[in-house]
Design a protein with these regions (language model features):
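Bacterial N-terminal signal peptides
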Residues: 9-19
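Bacterial N-terminal signal peptides that target proteins for export
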Residues: 1-11
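Phosphate-/polyanion-interacting regions in eukaryotic proteins
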Residues: 83
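Absolute N-terminal positional cue centered near the fourth residue
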Residues: 3-4, 19-21
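Exported/periplasmic ABC-transporter solute-binding proteins
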Residues: 24-67, 71-78, 87-95, 99-100, ...
Length: 261
């Protein structure tokens, strides 16, 4: 990973020293898949710099599985920091589960298409080519989280293929779509590129056409019942510091500030 500049290192030290003075804390984080690749690289750096320990619980940003973050919080599970797709985090803020003033946008990710490693790659360079790729595929997989909801409830209908592909398209719960594609259980699969990139055994064809693309923002906030709020704030500050930028970009995401420009 690229070494942060002197200015970035200085900012990182300033961000991290303040909470460290209060003593090491154990921070409980609930996180969905989209930001996980960058998060996994960054958390050890944060722990070394502060002495804090981060415990991670994973779940989808939405959906019916018990592991989904909204369902965990609804049944009273504790958390300090919540990291998930932005509009789902907004829903938790409306429900009083996340502190509204604590929300910070971390990064943006685009939906991409993947095939099993070595398989032919369909042409998705235009809307019509993308449409034909969907019709030609023998099986299609999409996630049960934000990107999959967009595909199944809006995009497939908008381009006029829903009725023709609904019997061969499958919503995947509880594991990355890429793993299903890697096992050969789906010919093509869709998920944010940051969730596809860590999966072995697949080839990422590329993002879906810009005209059809939805860019998911991933955001962080403090849970309303956070027991380690100060340490949680320090973690969030680190995740949006210049020191975090290389890991975010390497995961296939766009740094939130850059994406807004």
């Amino acid at each position: 990973m690229r070494v942060p500049t002197i200015a970035a290192r200085g900012l990182l030290i300033g961000v991290l020293l303040l909470p460290a003075a209060a003593g090491a804390a154990e921070i409980k984080v609930m996180i969905s898949g989209g930001f996980s690749a960058a998060y996994q690289k960054l958390v050890p750096e944060f722990e070394r710099a502060t002495g804090h320990k981060v415990t991670t619980v994973r779940g989808a940003s939405m959906g019916e599985t018990p592991q989904a973050i909204p369902n965990r919080l609804a049944r009273g599970e504790d958390a300090d920091v919540v990291i998930m797709v932005g509009y789902a985090l907004g829903g938790l803020i409306e429900q009083g589960k996340v502190r509204p003033e604590s929300r910070v946008d971390l990064a943006w990710s685009r939906i991409a298409l993947a095939v099993r490693a070595g398989a032919p790659k369909p042409d998705i360079s235009s809307v019509e080519n993308f449409r034909q790729a969907l019709l030609a595929a023998k099986s299609i997989a999409y996630s049960d989280s934000a990107s999959g909801m967009y595909l199944s409830s809006e995009l497939f209908r908008r381009i006029g293929v829903y009725d023709r592909i609904k019997d061969k398209a499958r919503k995947i719960s509880g594991e990355p779509v890429g793993r299903v594609v890697a096992r050969g259980e789906a010919e093509i699969g869709f998920q944010p590129i940051s969730e596809l990139r860590p999966v072995e055994g697949i080839d990422i064809v590329g993002p879906i056409p810009d005209e059809l693309q939805i860019v998911n923002v991933f955001a962080a906030g403090l849970a309303s019942n956070a027991k380690e709020a100060d340490a949680g704030k320090a973690l969030i500050a680190f995740l949006v510091s210049p020191a975090a930028r290389p890991a975010i970009l390497a995961s296939g995401m766009e740094f939130a500030d850059a994406a807004r420009k």
